[in-house]
Amino acid sequence: MIWTGLLVGFLFGIVLQRGRICFNSAFRDVLLFKDNYLFKLAVFTLALEMILFVLLSQVGLMQMNPKPLNLVGNIIGGFVFGLGMVLAGGCASGVTYRVGEGLTTAWFAALFYGLGAYATKSGAFSWWLSWVGQFKSPLSVEESAYYVKGAGPTISSVLGLNPWIPALVIAALFILWAFGTKTTSRETKFNWKIASVCLALVAGLGFITSTLSGRKYGLGITGGWINLFQGFLTNSPLNWEGLEIVGIILGAGVAAAVAGEFKLRMPKNPVTYLQVGIGGLLMGIGAVTAGGCNIGHFLTGVPQLALSSWLASIFFILGNWTMAWILFRR
């Protein structure tokens, strides 16, 4: 069933490209331009996923599998990842789908993202990951219809509540904010509400098909790039997440071509390649240190109510705002 990763990735790539979805922009634009369009898209998607993930778990199509809590890793890795995404000009999913659009700076960012992630996971920087690993929290959830046994702690497990309760409460608050506040105008047929629904549905499909393949997690980016590097360097086979990356690039490429938006684009200043390469490297190191990126933690972990994902996501945003301030506002 690992081939389903290619299908899910293809759909994911189409949604990302048509919705112009980048979490770097979603976080950064709120600070720099008071533009909440993409941030609303992200928040509404999280609300839909919170309800969808619990529902799919209850009917037996998946079990949520929150990432372990590691205060040091989540905080440091999250902040470094946030710094890197601004330098790279896109988040993990943003640079990945833009590879398919023909943006050459995204090629460099993605290349160094994968390199940084691979080096931290099993290469030259693996000593750092081993050191961070000692701070992993022993807290976990008990096995149930909702959660895999031994998975990381969640808001519901810490409070001793059925996951439906915090999921519905938080989702309601997110929806009230998204629909109760003024939205920054943007000319697009694929508006934030439609994009959110499509993104949540792809996330749900990703969790179901990934579970059937034995992976037991939803959408991700970092592990896929690591798998591609492993395949190139050690000739190891592609897994579900590696095929997902291939699918994202293909889906975004097809969507861009159909819309007449595919074009090889190069920066006016070649030094930009150095900047995005450094940014990609920081993102890769940060993502592995934090235990996930803006997709594995923010888009997939936060809806599972994972404490690690909420913590890492807060520091994604803080790191993003810090580098945005240094580059554009200082």
UniProtKB/Swiss-Prot annotation:
Main subcellular localisation: membrane
InterPro entries the UniProt entry points to: Sulf_transp_TsuA/YedE
Positions on the Periplasmic side per record topology: 1-2, 60-70, 122-162, 212-239, 290-306
Transmembrane segments: 3-18, 37-59, 71-87, 103-121, 163-180, 190-211, 240-258, 270-289, 307-326
Keywords: Cell inner membrane, Cell membrane, Membrane, Sulfate transport, Transmembrane, Transmembrane helix, Transport
Subcellular location: Cell inner membrane
First and last residue of the signal peptide: none
GO CC term, one of those recorded: plasma membrane
Catalytic activity: thiosulfate(in) = thiosulfate(out)
Membrane topology category: Multi-pass membrane protein
Parts of the chain on the Cytoplasmic side: 19-36, 88-102, 181-189, 259-269, 327-330
A Pfam family of this chain: Sulf_transp
UniProt similarity note: Belongs to the TsuA/YedE (TC 9.B.102) family.
Function: Mediates thiosulfate uptake.
Listed PANTHER family: INNER MEMBRANE PROTEIN YEDE, SULPHUR TRANSPORT DOMAIN-CONTAINING PROTEIN
Name by which UniProt lists this protein: Thiosulfate transporter TsuA
Species of provenance: Spirochaeta thermophila (strain ATCC 700085 / DSM 6578 / Z-1203)
Gene transcribed to yield this protein: tsuA
